[in-house]
Regions:
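Substrate-binding/gating loop at the entrance of the active-site cleft, primarily
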Residues: 40-55
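Active-site C-terminal subdomain of aminotransferase-like
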Residues: 133-214, 228
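Conserved active-site segment immediately N-terminal to the catalytic lysine
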Residues: 109, 123-134
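Conserved PLP-binding active-site segment of the aspartate aminotransferase-like
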Residues: 237-243, 259-273
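Conserved PLP-binding catalytic core of the aspartate aminotransferase-like
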Residues: 223-254
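Active-site phosphate-binding strand-loop segment of PLP-dependent enzymes
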Residues: 52, 63-116
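Conserved beta-loop-alpha segment that forms the PLP phosphate-binding cup at the N-terminus of a helix
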Residues: 8-33, 37, 45-46
Length: 273
């Protein structure tokens, strides 16, 4: 209801987190002699591409790695023989995010683990969406997959039942005992989102919060943002001190204000709000 998912899609609930989907997507969609395209926008996108190599060929359409993943590549070509294009809609470590649901000549597979339900999404523009619940949806232990029905069973390989999207679809995600409490926490979150006014209202709230933080980062001469302005994430606001030696002092400074856990990822440094 919140995502207005079309009737020709199945919603699957399973365990394993997004890391398992890095493998399950190519396992279910990609044959050994075929190619899947990947847009490299950060560590998680790179991990997904690495897993796909176990099941077929991969092609990286573009990468922002040479510029420390500070932006999302906009200009690239997707080979028409690609089985799918994989994108990571929000990059937690580097603070970049997609804000458009773009269509391509091939099905788009999106890892939306860290921005699902943060804004309205046109599900019809995707072949498959997956999201680990622990960021925006519920507690750890459950992963949501939204898959277009014609993609179920696409790969010809013999499949383990526990790794077969078709098995989950046929059994309403009840092939084995599901993580009931984790699913229940998702239900509570979805009810809360609906009560707030849905995803349009949530997007408005997220924009307001992010703009407030980014305005201070841009104003304050002690800090600078990591991501380029047009690709700045609303989910993960990454910033670094202009003088790296001030990092430890700032972490100590904010403790009396009950601000904890904002230390940035080791490859970027700085802070992450």
């Amino acid at each position: 209801e919140l995502l207005q998912i079309p009737d020709n899609y199945k919603v699957l609930l399973m365990q394993g987190g997004a890391n398992m989907q890095f493998a399950m997507v190519p396992y279910n969609l990609l044959n050994e002699n075929e190619t899947a395209s990947y847009l490299d926008t950060g560590v998680w996108a790179a991990k997904a591409e690495e897993e796909a190599r176990l099941y077929g060929k991969t092609h990286i359409v573009a990468s922002s790695k040479p510029d420390a993943y500070r932006y999302i590549p906009k200009t690239f070509e997707v080979p028409k023989d690609s089985v799918y294009l994989h994108v990571t809609s929000n990059n937690t470590i580097y603070g970049t995010e997609f804000f458009e649901d773009k269509s391509y000549d091939v099905p788009v597979v999106a890892d939306m683990s860290s921005d699902i339900f943060s804004r309205p999404v046109d599900v019809s523009r995707y072949g498959l969406i997956y999201a680990g619940a622990q960021k925006n949806l519920g507690s750890a232990g459950i992963t949501m997959v939204i898959i277009r029905e014609d993609l179920i069973g696409r790969s010809a390989r013999a499949k383990s039942k526990m790794w077969d999207y078709g098995i989950y679809a046929k059994n309403n995600s009840l092939y084995n005992t599901p993580p009931v409490f984790a699913i229940y926490t998702c239900l509570l979150t979805l009810r809360w989102l609906k009560k707030l006014g849905g995803l349009t209202a949530m997007e408005k709230r997220n924009k307001a919060k992010a703009e407030l933080l980014y305005a201070e980062i841009d104003r304050n001469p002690l800090f600078k943002g990591h991501a380029v302005a047009e690709d700045r994430s609303r989910m993960n606001i990454n910033f670094v001190p202009v003088h790296p030696e001030d990092e430890a002092a700032f972490l100590e400074f904010v403790k009396p204000y009950h601000i904890h856990g904002i230390k940035g990822y080791r490859t970027v440094g700085g802070f992450r709000a």
